[in-house]
Structure formats: C-alpha cells, structure tokens
From Swiss-Prot:
The lineage of its organism: Eukaryota, Metazoa, Chordata, Craniata, Vertebrata. Deubiquitinating enzyme that functions as a negative regulator of the innate immune system. Has peptidase activity towards 'Lys-48'- and 'Lys-63'-linked polyubiquitin chains. Can also cleave 'Lys-11'-linked ubiquitin chains (in vitro). Acts via TRAF3 deubiquitination and subsequent suppression of type I interferon (IFN) production. Controls neuroectodermal differentiation through cleaving 'Lys-48'-linked ubiquitin chains to counteract degradation of select chromatin regulators such as ARID1A, HDAC2 and HCF1. This is OTU domain-containing protein 5. The gene is Otud5. Belongs to the peptidase C85 family. The modification Phosphoserine is found at S64, S165, S177, S323, S332, S370, S447, S503. It comes from Rattus norvegicus. PROSITE patterns: OTU. Phosphorylation at Ser-177 is required for deubiquitinating activity. Phosphorylation at Ser-323, Ser-332 and Ser-503 by MTOR promotes its activity.
Length: 566
C-alpha cells in the first residue's frame, strides 16, 4: 500500500479548481485525444523517484523515426522513445517523437543523464513538477528543431495526475514548441558571435572535405525549411510557397495520423503553418518525406545526419539534405556531383541529370563534327597545295628537259654537219630554240613559217629567178613544232633543195611523246608571259629568211660557171 504525504494547505489566493485530488485511488484519466499522462517520474523526465508499478509504451503505426512496436524492458522503465506512465493513467496511441540533443551539449542545457527527450526539462525535475497533464505530449512547433519533443509549460509546484481542468489545460498548451524557440533565442543571444562564426566555418569545411557537400544559404525569413526543401526538389528556393501548400494539404489529408503529434487544435496548427513566415519542424519534415518519397536527412554541426525521416516506400533516390544552424535556421545541403532536382515529383521515366548529360553529349558531338570538318578542309588545302607544287615541279622538269634536249640536238647537228655550214645550222637551231621557248599555246595554228608566207612574202622575184620552190606549209608546220629541226641527219638532207622540202622529218625525232607534253603546257611554264609573241616570231622569221637567201645565193654561184670573156 502506498502512503501518500499529507495534503498541504492551499495558499489564500489559490484556485480550488487547480488543487490536486484528495488521497486515495487515482481515477482513470479521460481519453482526450489519446494523450499520455506523465507523472512525476525519475531522473529522465520529472526528477523524482520513478513509479515502478506499471508502464505502457505507445507505438508508431507507420514509417517514422520512432521504432515499430512496443519497446522491450521491465515495466516502468524509461526508454528513448517512451515515457513511464503512472498508475491509473491511460496510454493512447500517440508516442513521443525522437529528440537529438542540441548543439549545446549531449543532453541539452540542463538535461540529466536520462533526459533524452529534449532540452527544456532543466530545473523541472528538481521542482518535482508533473509534466503532461491528461493530454497529449506535444511534438514540434512553429520554430522547433529537427526532432525535439516538448512538454507543456506550467507553473512550478502545480500539477494534476489525471483530471485537470480544461481551462488550465488550454492555458498551459500554447504553441506546439514555443518554449524551445524562446530558449533557442536566449541561447543565441548568450553565445559569442566569434564562436558561432568559427563553428559555422568548421561545419561547412567538414561537410565539404569529408562528404563533398556544399551548404547553400537560404533566406532567413521563417520559411527557411521550406526554402531548403524547394531548393532540393525544384532547384529554386523561391518555390517554398508551393512546397508549404503541398505539405499542409498532405497534413490535412492525413490528419487522423499527424494530429496525434500536435498538442493544440490541429486545424489551428495547420492554419498557422500556412503562413509564409511561420517556421517548420520535424512534423513537416516527416510529411514531406512521405509526400516526395525521399528521406530527409538533417545535419547539425556533424558530418553524419543527426536525424533521418523516411518515407513510406523504400527506394534508391537521393535524400533531401538540410542543415540546422543555431537551433533556429535551416539551409540546403547540395551534392554537386549528383543531380537531385526533380526527384519525387512523380514524373514518369524521369532521370536526374539526364537532360544535362544529353545536352553535353550533343555539344560534344557537334564539336567533334565541326572539328572533323575543319580538319577535312585543312587536309584539302594541304592536298591542293601539294598538287599545285607537284604540277609546278613537273612543268619545271619538263621545261628543263626540253631545253636540254634542244641543246643536245644542236650539238649533234654541229658534229654531223661539220664546219661547212656552221652559221646556217646555228641559226636554224637558234631559231628553233626561240620558237620552242616562246610558249605558244597552239602549235598547229600559229606557225611562224605560215605567218611569214601569208603576211610578208619577201623577194618573190628572187624565188622565180632561182627556180626554187619555197618550203611548203606542211613542211614548215612540221619544222615549227617541237622537236627542233636541228636533229641529226646527213648533209645531203640539208642540200637537197626540193627533196628536203618533201622528205618526212618526223623520223628524225625519236622522242615524239615530248611534243605532246609540250603542246599541253601553258606559256607560263617557260616564263615567257611577259614577252610579246609577235616580236619574237618576227625576229626569228627575219633571221631565218636572211639565212635562207644567203644559202640560195651561194648555191647558185657554185652551180653556174663564170662566163667566157673570150
């Protein structure tokens, strides 16, 4: 049998409605929304002695940070995810949310060794205050941190075990975690700015060096959590209003589940959270993890996440990463080496980063095609230059070869003819050389012999007196073409007169293929473009005619005997 202490007399100004019940058996607590009544427990919650008579543990009905099913342990034992329940209290289906310790210390400011549920119980256990009177234990709030659970604030020394008055409950309820926000603001004001800046710098450097992540700063306007999620999902933090609206709509559609973790009226809570300047907490994180079916990882001055919110279905998608700073602000943690934008939006056959990869492939392909075309053009230019060079070399070789052939023929003619007619042979060879080097484009139509016979016939009476037939056009045409007429032959061929005009001269030239090559060559191959063809032909024609007349006169003198003077 439990012996209760005597009832203390109430102060004169005390409210009778707030007095504890008289000694005796505890009445059953009303089932107001399935709340968990918590008596003055041990060191983990209230600071007094734990009641070891009974304990009931609630369970999370779906994927969430709390573990599935009842927790093992002796009756009345305190766990990280459960609270000891005093005798007579009713345990509802609303479990307590997990609470990682804030950055101030492992158990939070004022937290004892067993205080694993938050940082707001400092001084409460020492005063022996009963926490959570006949109602649900609040989880999160307007400006709460990642997974910090809360208790209601009540005046020290005042509490009820099972049936507290509704008026006092409404006064003690307040916002869902307003006390933590006030405590966080007080801690921020007490911290040294230099220390805070150094801690932030270390946090960013550690994430970048170890994980390769980059902390992307979000605007500090109360919507930092939704801005961070919008940056992860849409790639634009200005989409935070859309993310907030979808999140609140999802909470309303699943109000039967999420209302178990809110101390105040759920509709009032949702209406307040729809404001763009209202902070988000881990209830919204859990909703967004289920809504986008992506885990939500929270980093707080550590390279490993302090809390992870899972969706309903497991997949291999990249998680939504956010960082928690100074217990009041969220930023987006971006992995620059892996695209996550668009994941979770329900787009069919969507592959993160596929558009960028496709654009990169197209750009590389276009660049390669342009480079190949440029190289082909350069090769064509080089081939054209090579061909032009080869043609120039071939023309030069052909010209030098032809001139050398002419010189060889002239030497052979001098050797065969002897000293009898050196002047005629040299003149004929020189005229042939000049005619060959003049660079005529049409050998068959522009013969110097034809032009001389047609335009300027000189001394026709001399030809009549001598009785010598001038060279026929066909013979002159053959002589005008390359090969030179200074080909080797007998002396009778040069003194035969009419027989020489009709004899076939083609047999005198063994290299007939050279003539075809020279006929196809342009005058530029010989470098004679700057010379006047008419002047060259006129000079050659004059020399040839003069030599021909001189030879005729000498032949006539030798044939006719001198007249008899007797």
């Amino acid at each position: 049998m439990t012996i209760l202490p005597k009832k203390k007399p109430p102060p004169p100004d005390a409210d009778p409605a707030n007095e504890p019940p008289p000694p005796g058996p505890l009445p059953p607590a009303p089932r107001r929304g399935g709340g968990v009544g918590v008596g003055g427990g041990g060191t983990g919650v209230g600071g007094g002695e734990r009641d070891r008579d009974s304990g009931v543990v609630g369970a999370r009905p779906r994927a969430s940070p709390p573990p599935q099913g009842p927790l093992p342990g002796p009756p009345g034992a305190l766990h990280r995810w459960a609270l000891a329940v005093p005798p007579g209290a009713v345990a509802g289906p609303r479990p307590q949310q997990a609470s990682p310790p804030p950055c101030g210390g492992p158990g939070g400011p004022g937290g004892g060794p067993g205080d694993a549920l938050g940082a707001t119980t400092a001084g409460v256990g020492a005063a022996g205050v009963v926490v959570g009177v006949g109602g649900p234990v609040g989880v999160g709030g307007c400006c709460s941190g990642p997974g910090h659970s809360k208790r209601r604030r009540q005046a020290p020394g005042v509490g009820a075990v099972g049936g507290a008055s509704p008026e006092r409950e409404e006064v003690g309820a307040g916002y869902n975690s307003e006390d933590e926000y006030e405590a966080a603001a007080a801690r921020i004001e007490a911290m040294d700015p230099a220390t805070v800046e150094q801690q932030e710098h270390w946090f960013e450097k550690a994430l970048r060096d170890k994980k390769g992540f980059i902390i992307k700063q979000m605007k500090e306007d109360g919507a930092c959590l939704f801005r961070a999620v919008a940056d992860q999902v849409y790639g634009d933090q200005d989409m935070h209003e859309v993310v907030r609206k979808h999140c609140m709509d999802y909470l309303m559609k699943n109000a039967d589940y999420f209302s178990n973790y809110v101390t105040e009226d759920f509709t009032t809570y949702i209406n307040r959270k729809r404001k763009n300047n209202c902070h988000g907490n881990h209830i919204e994180m859990q909703a967004m993890a289920e809504m986008y079916n992506r885990p939500v990882e929270v980093y707080q001055y550590s390279t490993e996440p302090i809390n992870t919110f899972h969706g309903i279905h497991q997949n291999e998608d990249e998680p939504i990463r956010v960082s928690y700073h100074r217990n009041i602000h969220y930023n987006s943690v971006v992995n620059p080496n892996k695209a996550t934008i668009g994941v979770g939006l329900g787009l069919p056959s969507f592959k993160p980063g596929f558009a960028e990869q496709s654009l990169m492939k197209n750009a590389i392909k276009t660049s390669e095609e342009s480079w190949i075309e440029q190289q082909m053009l350069e090769d064509k230019k080089r081939a054209t230059d090579w061909e032009a060079t080869n043609e120039a070399i071939e023309e030069q070789v052909a010209r030098e070869s032809y001139l050398q052939w002419l010189r060889d023929q002239e030497k052979q003619a001098r050797q065969v003819r002897g000293p009898s007619q050196p002047r005629k042979a040299s003149a004929t060879c020189s005229s042939a050389t000049a005619a060959a080097s003049s660079g005529l484009e049409e050998w068959t139509s522009r013969s110097p012999r034809q032009r001389s016979s047609a335009s300027s016939p000189e001394h026709p009476e001399l030809h009549a007196e001598l009785g010598i037939k001038p060279p026929s056009p066909g013979t002159v045409l053959a002589l005008a073409k390359p090969p030179s007429p200074c080909a080797p032959g007998t002396s009778s061929q040069f003194s035969a007169g009419a027989d020489r005009a009709t004899s076939p001269l083609v047999s005198l030239y063994p290299a007939l293929e050279c003539r075809a090559l020279i006929q196809q060559m342009s005058p530029s191959a010989f470098g004679l473009n700057d010379w006047d063809d008419d002047e060259i032909l006129a000079s050659v024609l004059a020399v040839s005619q003069q030599e021909y007349l001189d030879s005729m006169k000498k032949n006539k003198v030798h044939r006719d005997p001198p007249p008899d003077k007797s």
